[in-house]
Amino acid sequence: GAAAAEGNVLDAKTRELIALAVAVTTRCESCIGVHADEAVKAGATEEEVAAALAMSIALNAGAAYTYSLRALEAYNAQKGE
């Protein structure tokens, strides 16, 4: 949110990519939808989203893979694909 953005040296796209990866790692389904939407609004590409999700998979193994598929679906739904 706005509090996380204030004074943050990370740009909005980077923050949302991190947030999406964290949402996958913590298995927060509603968070995945929110941050997929915000990633689209911030201009994240599918390749960037996939790279962020790959980090989540590497750190969280199998469960992150399943949730990463959901995150990509949410991203594509928000993007209109």
What are these regions (language model features)?
Residues A50-N76:
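C-terminal structural segments of small proteins and small subunits
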Residues G1-E16, V40, T66-E81:
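Acidic, glycine/proline-rich low-complexity segments that act as flexible tails and inter-domain linkers
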Residues I18, V22-V34:
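Short, thiol/selenol-centered motifs that function as redox-active sites or metal-ligating centers
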Residues K13-A23, A52-L59:
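Alpha-helical scaffold segments that form or flank carboxylate-/histidine-based iron centers
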Residues D11-A12, E29, E46:
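Alpha-helix N-cap/helix-initiation sites
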Residues G33-E47, L72-Y75:
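Iron-sulfur (Fe-S) cluster-binding segments and ferredoxin-like electron-carrier domains
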